Amino acid sequence: MVKKIQESKEKKALKAASGTRKDKKKWGDGRKKEEVRRAVTVSEELLAKVRKDVGRASVVTRYMIGSRYNLNLGVAENVLRHLSNEGVVQQVLGNRRMTIYAGCRAQEQ
């Protein structure tokens, strides 16, 4: 075996400092997702807005209510159940994962 000649510390430092290699990728500097704070409670004003808009809609899901009014999906589901009990919307289709409602005014037309 051939013995390697050891480089001095100065040569190693110069070699490391020279820009021959590409800069190392820094991990963790990627895009950061914006945190959206969703409402957990529903005020009477918001419920009145939802009641007005949902009554005219042909199809309503909990995702539509949650994204439009910035509500948690569970809260949106509770709002739709409440409106269904009031008679503003009517359940059209439902299974264990998703429930689809339709506004009562939209069904009459």
Curated annotation (Swiss-Prot):
It comes from the Eukaryota. The keyword Ribonucleoprotein applies. GO terms for cellular component: ribonucleoprotein complex; ribosome. Residues 1-34 are annotated as: Disordered. Gene3D superfamilies: 3.30.63.20. Residues 1-13 have a biased composition (Basic and acidic residues). Keywords: Ribonucleoprotein, Ribosomal protein. Disulfide bonds: none annotated. Belongs to the eukaryotic ribosomal protein eS25 family. This is Small ribosomal subunit protein eS25. It comes from Encephalitozoon cuniculi (strain GB-M1) (Microsporidian parasite).
